[in-house]
From Swiss-Prot:
Catalyzed reaction equations: ATP + protein L-histidine = ADP + protein N-phospho-L-histidine
Pfam families xrefs: HATPase_c, PAS_8, PAS_9
Cited function: Member of the two-component regulatory system TdiR/TdiS, which probably regulates transcription of toluene catabolic genes (bss operon). May activate TdiR by phosphorylation.
Matching Gene3D superfamilies: 1.10.287.130, Histidine kinase-like ATPase, C-terminal domain, PAS domain
Gene: tdiS
Protein name, entry field: Sensor protein TdiS
Superkingdom per UniProt: Bacteria
Length: 548
């Protein structure tokens, strides 16, 4: 729907209802908890109640006034106008964080988000949403001050701790020399050395591992034949950012030790053959015994902790993404709702024109064109209805549905992806299938995920090989409906076959690993099963069942 049609419909609604704010979507605009305004040429056309309350203005007081009222200075008003005057010619949405002045002269910090009503007709103006973040800013300032105080305290404590550590290291060195002199305590020392839950190694200036305990052998491993050196170890080492570290450049090697000690350096270790990966926290001290420099290093296995940290990071990222999707769903539903009435009005006008033309000679061609316009408006209304149903919150209700129609509706949502990736969709649907009791939105979500995965799996294949097959059949006992999605993509690695449905497991660089987990939960809640199988050398087939 164009911006002119929206403006025309607004004028008609106001004329019919005497500008009553309780009519149609005016109620939504006026009573939404978000501060919203409509601008044209940097002047207010209309503001909702929340916007006027936020900045201390009476109802209608800002109408037709310049937005200069909200800027702290003339300079800021002029500068922002010059910098962003042509912003929407290159971008769809504007978002900024800035101070805004209220009517009483007080200043509050806000997040300002705006976009054109109609990108094809900028003269209609733009819509803006303002969020008050003053309390958040004050909290940030308080937190920053607290952090600065804490940093000073930590620095002081660190200096004290460094003194204690140096003193402790001297005591340890003294005790070690005493133990070497006292040979009668050697046996006790060796037992303690090998019973420690952390790996310990002693390395000389040439990189030879002179001594290591059992835990070190289990964590790092050692060659079967001496001499044992770091160069002979089969492992590959890397930092937390993935940068490889040569064995001779390991932080605890003598050549790289700049100070007497290093503390809790995290480093990754991967075996060349098994590709098994571990994470270690390494601390070391530089000692001089009998005139020879040696390094004593302690290795702690932190693999489990690193996995937990990664899972927490993925969970946090997913919660953030779901929050954005939630907001987008609300906006999509509101847009579908607001565009519905203009479509119905346009459809009624066209149908009226068509009825009048039926009795006019020579108007058959015009009547046919109007019929096509009516058909396209019906299709637009149906698309809006599907979008609204798909994104709105709903209580899962299972009703008898034609599974073929559910599949077709899902493909309509993915038509853009299908054409963009040059994918050929091969439908193998049984005619007139029996009705299946299901929650349409949830099953569409499953199909959406499986079809999208199939399209992405074939993105690097030759265009003629990008064939996606979707089909269904009734089970041999007649009690369930089988639906499958089969692609001819790169396939799934052997190591990933058994973990395909594990939460947070993914083979995609930007994936989160929860899509198939959610799909399986939905299918199981319907009393069905979701399974995966390979199809030849390449390709994958996902199949799920639903009770009839």
């Amino acid at each position: 729907m164009s911006g002119n049609a929206i403006a025309s419909t607004e004028t008609e609604m106001e004329a019919d209802h005497g500008n009553d704010p309780a009519t149609g979507y005016e109620v939504i605009f006026r009573n939404t908890p978000l501060a919203i305004c409509h601008l044209r040429n940097r002047a207010f056309v209309r503001c909702n109640t929340r916007f006027e309350e936020l900045f201390g203005y009476a109802r209608g007081e800002l109408d037709n006034k310049s937005v200069r009222l909200l800027y702290p200075t003339d300079e800021s008003f002029r500068t922002i106008g010059e910098n962003y005057g042509h912003f929407f010619e290159r971008h769809d949405t504007f978002k900024d964080e800035r101070p805004i002045i209220r009517k009483d002269g007080s200043v509050i910090w806000c997040i300002v988000t705006g976009s054109l009503l109609d990108s094809s007709n900028p003269r209609l103006g733009s819509i803006w949403v303002v969020q008050d973040i003053s309390e958040h800013k004050r909290t940030e300032d308080d937190l920053k001050a607290s952090v600065e105080k804490l940093e000073i305290l930590v620095h002081q404590r660190t200096l004290e701790l460094h003194k204690h550590v140096n003193k402790l290291e001297q005591e340890v060195a003294t005790r070690k020399l005493a133990e070497e002199v006292a040979n009668e305590h050697r046996e006790k020392y060796e037992k303690l050395f090998h019973m420690l839950p952390i790996g310990i190694s002693i390395t000389d200036n040439e990189g030879r591992i002179l001594e290591a305990n059992r835990q070190f052998t289990e964590l790092v491993g050692t060659p079967e034949k001496p001499p044992i050196t770091w160069q002979q170890l089969p492992q590959r080492f890397f930092l937390s950012d993935g940068t490889k570290v040569a064995r001779k450049r390991l932080p605890w090697r003598i050549h790289d030790v700049q100070k007497d000690s290093i503390k809790n350096i995290e480093i990754g270790m991967r075996e060349e053959e098994s590709r098994k990966q571990r994470w270690l926290s390494v601390s070391s001290s530089l000692l001089e015994l009998k005139g020879q420099k040696m390094v004593v290093a302690a290795f702690t296995d932190i693999t489990y902790r690193k996995r937990i940290e990664e899972l927490e990071r993925l969970r946090h990222a997913e919660l953030t993404r779901l929050g954005r999707i939630n907001a987008m769903a609300g906006m999509a539903a509101a847009l579908a709702h607001q565009m519905g009435q203009p479509l119905v009005s346009a459809l009624n006008y066209l149908q009226g024109c068509r009825l009048r033309l039926e009795h006019i000679r020579g108007a058959a061609e015009i009547s046919q064109s109007l019929g096509l316009a009516i058909t396209h408006l019906d299709q637009a209304g149906e698309i809006l209805r599907r979008v609204k149903d798909f994104v709105c919150k709903h209580t899962p209700e299972r009703t008898p549905e034609n599974i073929n129609e559910v599949i077709q509706d899902t493909l309509s949502f993915l038509s853009f992806d299908v054409h963009r990736h040059n994918v050929t969709v091969n439908l193998q649907l049984i005619p007139s299938p029996p009705a299946v009791p299901l929650c349409k939105i949830e099953i569409q979500q499953v199909l959406f995920n499986l079809v999208k995965n199939g399209i992405e799996a074939m993105s690097e294949m030759e265009p003629e090989s990008r064939i996606l097959t979707i089909g269904n059949e009734i089970s041999t006992d007649g009690r369930s409906m089988k639906i499958f999605v089969q692609d001819h993509g790169v396939g799934v690695e052997k190591r990933a076959e058994k973990r395909a449905f594990e939460p947070y497991f993914t083979t995609k660089p930007d994936g989160l690993g929860i899509g198939l987990t959610i799909c399986r939960s939905i299918i199981e809640s319907h009393g069905g099963e979701l399974s995966f199988s390979k199809t030849g050398e390449r390709g994958s087939k996902f199949q799920f069942t639903l009770p009839i």
